[in-house]
Amino acid sequence: MELDRDARMLAMAKIERPFFPIIYVRGYAMTRDEIVQTTSTPYMGFEAGSTKVRQAQDGSIVKFVFESPLVRLMKDYNYRDVYAAGSEQSDKLPARSLVIHRYYDEADPAFGSGKTPSITEAATALGQRITRLRDSVCGEDVAARKAFRVYLVAHSMGGLICRCLLQNPDVATAEIRAMVDKVFTYATPHNGIELGGINVPSFLSM
């Protein structure tokens, strides 16, 4: 059993495709209450799963427990979050780390200034987080730093933040953008939504 544990720990520490670190970027929180509710949870909603699927021929609800993709990554592929002893760890982290980009913490007066960051500001902070994560995972290992990549998983406006990071040269350097291996977005308005006559993706080029 100890040998199995050691083997798992070694695999978790190694920078190796497809098990790169994963950064989750949540979507838009409209009201102050939604922001506070968001910042009050460790995973900002990404841990939400389900117990019901509607697949029975007679239309009845079938119970099926799906723990959420984030939890399944921990259970099935030995990923770990970066929380320990009540805080977010910044020292040596395994390659199979799950990180929540907590850009809304700044908007919660309990944690920050109370001012909601713009898409550009959140994207800039995301680039800084990627750099810190590389340093925490790789240290000064030159080969590991060269091999380091991350996956971005984004919901709703989080996808626009990821696009801003990758498409706006004023937000992140080419070195930071090159560390992003893949981006997965869902419910992201890539074609834009009209808010008071302003098309949201236009912010990406500002």
Located regions from the model:
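N-terminal non-catalytic accessory region
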Residues: 1-153, 157-206
